[in-house]
Regions:
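Phosphate/NTP-binding elements of NTP-utilizing enzymes
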Residues: 1-193
Length: 193
């Protein structure tokens, strides 16, 4: 009897761990989020009040593109191959505290890796950002095709020069950027239709 109870507790803990490290499979967007995700527009804006899930929506969509694991309800754009992407915010710290946290997990807790929108078992190599505690510069994510998607973290404060040069599939701008950064984001994805 005691062994059965201990085994049941172990199973419950493992199920909870799997749920926590695979948020992508459990995401149930509100109607306004689903409408945003299902738009096929090449440029989109999700404007809503504070603390209602805008950043979560951006992170979940980015995770779908990075992994190629789109839900059944998805009608938006799909990538059938690994992608190159950037996620950006106002500063290195806010990019870490919002974008990185929503995608990977709490930045200052190594045990939280994989508790963001990207499932733990699909996170590959991560590269730290120099000079910014607990911040990532980039990471790779296993795509369902077997290849690796690449995600870089950028900050508007870096200036437009740091946003130049790369050809990308997806750019997630978590807060309204300066016009020069927005222009660079458009240029990076210009040939992606």
């Amino acid at each position: 009897m005691k062994e059965n109870l201990e085994r049941a507790v172990e199973i419950a803990k493992e199920l909870e761990r799997r749920k926590i490290t695979n948020r992508l499979s459990y995401y149930e967007p509100y109607d306004y989020q689903k409408k945003f995700h299902n738009s096929n527009a090449t440029q989109r804006l999700l404007m809503a009040g504070n603390r209602v899930g805008k950043s979560l929506s951006g992170a979940m969509e980015m995770a779908y593109h990075l992994t190629g694991k789109y839900p059944e309800w998805w009608e938006g754009r799909k990538f059938e191959r690994p992608v190159r992407a950037w996620a950006g915010g106002v500063s290195n710290e806010t990019t870490r505290d919002v974008c990185q946290k929503e995608l990977v997990g709490q930045p200052d807790d190594p045990s939280a890796k994989g508790t963001g929108s990207v499932p733990l078992d699909l996170i590959g190599e991560t590269v730290r950002k120099a000079g910014v505690p607990n911040a990532l510069n980039s990471l790779v994510v296993r795509h369902i095709t077997g290849g690796w998607s690449r995600l870089g973290f950028k900050a508007y404060e870096m200036g437009k020069e740091k946003w130049m040069g790369e050809q990308l599939d997806v750019v997630w701008l978590d807060e309204e950027p300066p016009a020069s950064i927005y222009s660079q984001a458009l240029t990076r994805t210009a040939d992606k239709g």
